[in-house]
């Protein structure tokens, strides 16, 4: 599965895809002061509610207009999904 982050100034839209099919999506607040662990905590809850596990994620892509969030989401991807994001 693919986890896509579309980061805007106000919100991060996260989508989970299996092939071309969008399985789930969520909207989180964009916060450059949030840590990778903080985002992982929120995503972990959303994953569990929807019957997903971090180990289901095989690829991560980050699209952003907020450059300071890139290292945070890169760290999240590496630490929790064991994936180097695109």
Spans of features found by a protein language model:
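Residue-level preference for the first positions of well-ordered beta-strands
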Residues: 1-2, 59
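Short beta-strand-loop/turn "lid" adjacent to the catalytic site in phosphate-handling enzymes
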Residues: 50-86
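Short glycine-rich, Thr/Ser-proximal phosphate-binding strand/loop in the N-terminal lobe
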Residues: 2-45
């Amino acid at each position: 599965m693919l986890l896509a982050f579309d980061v805007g100034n106000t919100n991060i839209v996260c989508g989970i895809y299996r092939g071309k099919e969008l399985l789930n999506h969520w909207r989180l607040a964009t916060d450059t002061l949030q840590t990778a662990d903080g985002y992982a905590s929120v995503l972990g809850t959303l994953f569990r509610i929807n019957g997903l596990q971090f180990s289901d994620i095989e690829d991560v892509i980050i699209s952003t207009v907020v450059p300071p969030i890139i290292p945070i989401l890169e760290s999240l991807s590496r630490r929790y999904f064991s994936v180097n994001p695109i």
